[in-house]
Regions:
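Extended acidic/polar, glycine-enriched regions
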Residues: 1-53
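Extended ligand-binding clefts on enzyme/binding-domain cores
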Residues: 76-96
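Low-complexity, Ser/Thr/Pro/Gly-enriched N-terminal "stalk/linker" regions
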Residues: 8, 39-76, 80, 100-108
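Structural helix-adjacent loops and short alpha-helical linkers that scaffold large soluble proteins
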Residues: 18-28, 51, 93-106, 113
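Active-site-adjacent bridging/hinge elements
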Residues: 28-34, 57-67, 108-119, 138
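Helix-terminus loop motifs that line ligand-binding clefts
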Residues: 97-143
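Solvent-exposed loop and edge beta-strand segments that line ligand/cofactor-binding
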Residues: 3, 69-82, 123-135
Length: 143
């Protein structure tokens, strides 16, 4: 069994196996779904089925982009960018009422402040990056 230390995100899986002419039987394949355990407490109703599908995709995305922190995407960087985090925090609060990740994000970003008050654009991260307007998003989150 292969189980990575950190989760891997995928939609499709291609397995290339060379058997050198020997028969191959895959007895079992499984994967585990991982997402932050936000509960959907808000209700979205519409007589347009397409809008309900958009709601479902958006809510699934919100859950997939949250784990120990909020992050920009579950596939690539997995970094908590302030610009994305503010939107994700509002979605979490409005739909679930769960404020744990919101409070965590506010504290994380507070810890990222430089001496002049600007926050890093993404935190926690080993590589400091500053996008000045993102500091204002953090101020808006605290307000």
């Amino acid at each position: 069994m292969f189980r990575p230390v950190w989760f891997r995100t995928w939609r499709y899986l291609q397995i290339d196996i060379e058997t050198n002419g020997e028969p191959l039987q895959i007895n079992r394949f499984s994967s585990e779904f991982t997402a932050y355990p936000l509960k959907e407490n808000a209700i979205f109703e519409s007589d347009q089925s397409g809008l309900k599908k958009i709601w479902n995709v958006g809510w699934r995305t919100a859950r997939l982009c949250a784990n120990e922190t909020y992050f920009d995407c579950p596939y690539y960087e997995q970094l908590q960018y302030v610009g994305d985090t503010r939107i994700q925090a509002l979605v979490s609060l409005y739909v679930s009422g769960d404020d744990r990740l919101v409070r965590n994000a506010i504290m994380n970003l507070s810890e990222s402040q430089f001496y002049e008050g600007l926050t890093r654009s993404r935190y926690p991260s080993a590589n400091p990056q500053i996008i000045p307007p993102f500091s204002l998003y953090w101020v808006d989150m605290v307000n």
